[in-house]
């Protein structure tokens, strides 16, 4: 009998969670940032979901959020026609980058010196963060609003997606190398540096392409419209979520569906594997983030696996290791197909 998923539920947002991103692994662990229509992106400890802080300053929905590799900086994209760069340690706003329309996506180079942005004005912009007063470099060519833009190939190239097109750009010449056209709206895009793989979702399809050439590798079909998908760092598994509130887990090599379960109480907008591959996070229309174990029952983070006593005949089952601080209250709830526990939540100030 398979063990049941026991997700960690991260509350605190008051509107739909539309984007999330993990940092790399640092000496202090790894971190998770979430973008939400409430305009208040949040930073959390990646392996427990515990709230660290909220970045305050946007005056509209935040559509995109990212952390640099060592989690010292954060960047956000918002409906207030700005992208902002933040000190992720202090929470201070470092700079506001004014745009002419809604900003949807942000991405740091590996050295954190440049920020790529894209949005409703159909332009890609590259900001030199060491020269905040300088005008950004601009790349035009998209025919509709840009949903996602990512650095790839050690920052030598850029991948960007609008409504029905994915484009590959050369950073040095600022010119288009190749494009892919789809017959329906592209809902998400993920870049995997190891192996240079691009994961694209559209409709019920999850497609894998070479990030260098955009040549197809393989594709899966899901039972419902998919809004986001993420490939495990070791390329063992793929997880996806979408309009039917469910999370799907696939064997990447065979394409076999390994499990599916109701993950949220609303459509799932974003899913991502952690940098160590031990868990994945999902964000939803229901306003929550949830963290899920890749291997159910393994001792990791707040999940503590308790083996059964000899001859008891009981199955091993995951137990939750409760933090010993009064501030971190964890409640157990039941959802349709899974148990759930809560990570620590933001402090409410009068």
From Swiss-Prot:
This is Serine-threonine kinase receptor-associated protein. Belongs to the WD repeat STRAP family. InterPro entries: G-protein_beta_WD-40_rep (IPR020472), WD40/YVTN_repeat-like_dom_sf (IPR015943), WD40_repeat_dom_sf (IPR036322), WD40_rpt (IPR001680). Residues 326-350 are annotated as: Disordered. Its main location: cytoplasm. GO terms for molecular function: mRNA binding; RNA binding; signaling receptor binding; U2 snRNP binding. GO terms for cellular component: cytoplasm; cytosol; nucleus; SMN complex; SMN-Sm protein complex. GO terms for biological process: alternative mRNA splicing, via spliceosome; maintenance of gastrointestinal epithelium; negative regulation of transcription by RNA polymerase II; negative regulation of transforming growth factor beta receptor signaling pathway; neuron differentiation; protein-RNA complex assembly; spliceosomal snRNP assembly. The SMN complex catalyzes the assembly of small nuclear ribonucleoproteins (snRNPs), the building blocks of the spliceosome, and thereby plays an important role in the splicing of cellular pre-mRNAs. Most spliceosomal snRNPs contain a common set of Sm proteins SNRPB, SNRPD1, SNRPD2, SNRPD3, SNRPE, SNRPF and SNRPG that assemble in a heptameric protein ring on the Sm site of the small nuclear RNA to form the core snRNP (Sm core). The gene is Strap. SMART domains: WD40. Keywords: Cytoplasm, mRNA processing, mRNA splicing, Nucleus, Phosphoprotein, Repeat, WD repeat.
